């Protein structure tokens, strides 16, 4: 059989496989929790990278639910299946990955809209009638920050320094706002997901379809994949430890809402992150995991790869929770990445750690993914060479699909998600070696530490999530470190 060659029988087999996979995940979860098994992990390290789908990174990994044989996509709805997967290099274009983009790609479960979602007029034409949720005003406060004023009531907030946002400049190559601190806002200032341009998605949607000829040469990379020649370290981790092939982003859309799910099991109905030419400044009123950790005396730290880690941005929304506005009590818990290495060597690593990259090391297109891969590898090597290896679990995830193709329709557990699959690696002496097919999302990370420390769930999302316990085998002989060097 030729690469990617399959037919209707293959589709039916794949659907049967997915059904069996879901049933098995529920059985595994029940068996693990019913045993009341203790968890000999004392340090959880969550490394969060950027913007790649599962099929983009592991679509050809042996044993994983990867790119189907014969996979092909149309350039426009109802068009011929003329586009096929291509092997990409270390640098890929940045594709749209807003709420609307994800809905266009999803196409009611057909998973065939990745090309037409990228046309400049696609949102105006094809997105007509797609509802866009608005933030719950009881959970999210939206304020416009301009160059002339800081929103009232935020002057005492450590992260309210206007230079962090008002000096951000639109980078036409990266298609992002990039600030002096090195972070990016992934959405165009004319983002129709928010603000007065919402009417583009309703009765006033554009009457003319996108062109179907002369597509940009970079567009083909939305249907691309990488292999072990491009990201060899990640593939080595996948072979040596655990690869999850049913790990979904928590909602369809960009970074900020998914990072909120990562720490709070909700986004307050927020599905976007900026628009209308102004930096949109949010304050969040709902609880998050660090509240639970603090109340339970579980140590934690957020390590951030920017010049001032206390500044809130789309990959680190913690400083923008309203409860920290006048009393920035979480300041000792937010540190630069260098502090992570110090904590490893000084024996002061907290029980729960999050690692958020700089833009250069994030793998966010068009950044070189190998630069991000080696940043992650250095972190993993440092843990493996420390005293913490014997008692740790390192979980590496990517925060959203980045506009890249994935063939698995995400389960629609509520109006917000799941979003598309993203890669997830579990690296631990107790990793269950191989591919785990259990369904997870970012709230599964919350469920894991809630289970370990007997914490109450934050929302129904983490209450109902699988906790990733079946990624571990606590009765096995502990696995040795796998040190990777250049």
Task: Give the label of every model feature segment.
Residues 1-13:
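N-terminal secretory signal peptides that target proteins for export/translocation
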Residues 3-5, 29, 237, 437:
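Exposed boundary/loop context
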Residues 12-15, 35:
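Basic polycationic patches enriched in arginine
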Residues 17-29:
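Bacterial N-terminal signal peptides
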Residues 31-33:
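N-terminal signal peptide c-region/cleavage motif recognized by signal peptidases
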Residues 35-486:
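N-terminal pro-sequences and low-complexity stem/linker regions of secreted or lumenal proteins
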């Amino acid at each position: 059989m030729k690469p990617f060659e399959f037919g209707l029988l293959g589709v039916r087999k794949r659907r049967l496989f997915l059904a069996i996979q879901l049933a098995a995940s529920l059985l595994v979860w029940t068996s693990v929790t019913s045993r009341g098994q203790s968890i000999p992990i004392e340090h959880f390290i969550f490394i969060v990278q950027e913007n790649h789908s599962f099929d983009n990174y592991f679509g050809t990994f042996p044993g994983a639910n990867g790119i189907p044989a014969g996979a092909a996509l149309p350039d426009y709805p109802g068009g011929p299946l003329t586009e096929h997967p291509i092997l990409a290099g270390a640098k890929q274009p940045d594709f749209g990955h807003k709420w609307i983009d994800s809905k266009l790609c999803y196409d009611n479960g057909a998973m065939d809209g990745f090309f037409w979602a990228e046309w400049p007029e696609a949102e105006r034409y094809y997105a007509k009638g797609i509802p866009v949720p608005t933030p719950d005003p009881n959970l999210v406060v939206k304020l416009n920050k301009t160059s002339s004023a800081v929103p009232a009531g935020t002057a005492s907030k450590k992260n309210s320094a206007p230079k962090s946002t008002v000096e951000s400049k639109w980078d036409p190559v990266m298609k992002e706002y990039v600030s002096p601190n090195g972070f990016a806002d992934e959405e165009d200032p004319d983002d129709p997901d928010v603000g007065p341009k919402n009417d583009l998605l309703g009765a006033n949607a554009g009457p003319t379809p996108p062109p179907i000829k002369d597509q940009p040469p970079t567009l083909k990379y939305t249907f691309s994949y990488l292999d072990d020649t491009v990201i060899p370290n990640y593939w080595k981790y996948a072979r040596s430890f655990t690869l999850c092939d049913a790990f979904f982003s928590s909602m369809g859309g960009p970074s900020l809402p998914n990072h909120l799910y990562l720490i709070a099991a909700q986004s307050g109905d927020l599905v976007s992150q900026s628009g209308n030419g102004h930096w949109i400044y949010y304050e969040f009123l709902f609880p998050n995991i660090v509240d639970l950790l603090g109340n339970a005396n579980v140590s934690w730290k957020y390590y951030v790869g920017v010049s001032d880690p206390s500044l809130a941005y789309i990959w680190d929304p913690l400083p923008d929770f309203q409860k920290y506005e006048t009393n920035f009590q979480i300041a000792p818990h937010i540190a630069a990445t260098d502090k992570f290495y110090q904590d490893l060597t000084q024996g002061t690593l907290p029980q729960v750690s999050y690692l958020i990259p700089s833009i250069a090391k994030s793998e966010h297109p068009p950044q070189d993914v190998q630069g991000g891969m080696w940043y992650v590898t250095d972190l993993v090597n440092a843990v493996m060479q420390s005293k913490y290896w014997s008692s740790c679990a390192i979980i590496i995830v990517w925060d959203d699909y980045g506009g890249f193709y994935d063939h698995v329709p995400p389960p629609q557990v509520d109006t917000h998600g799941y979003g598309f699959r993203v890669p997830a690696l579990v690296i631990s002496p107790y990793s269950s070696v191989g591919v785990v097919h259990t369904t997870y999302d970012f709230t599964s990370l919350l469920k894991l530490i809630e289970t370990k420390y007997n914490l109450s769930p934050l929302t129904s999302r983490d209450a109902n999530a699988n906790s990733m316990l079946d990624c571990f085998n606590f009765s096995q002989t502990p696995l040795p470190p796998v040190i990777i060097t250049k």
